[in-house]
């Protein structure tokens, strides 16, 4: 399993994939890029997280997330985790 930094994580999301961090405490969390459509209230793309409970909420990166090099695509874990 190859890990990478936030820049590559963004590229994965721009290609429609989901990413997660090995350092996150909760298993099953991942982030993904949402591109609004005509029905959306949002007008620009944004990143959201799927939480351990399965809730979807907008996501903001912490300093630790930005500098981390333990990002992986969820395909490496056998799909969305």
Question: Where in this protein do the model-derived segments appear?
Answer:
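Short, compact, well-ordered microdomains
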Residues: 49-81
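Catalytic phosphate/metal-binding cores of nucleic-acid and nucleotide-processing enzymes, i.e., regions
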Residues: 1-32, 39-44, 48-55, 63
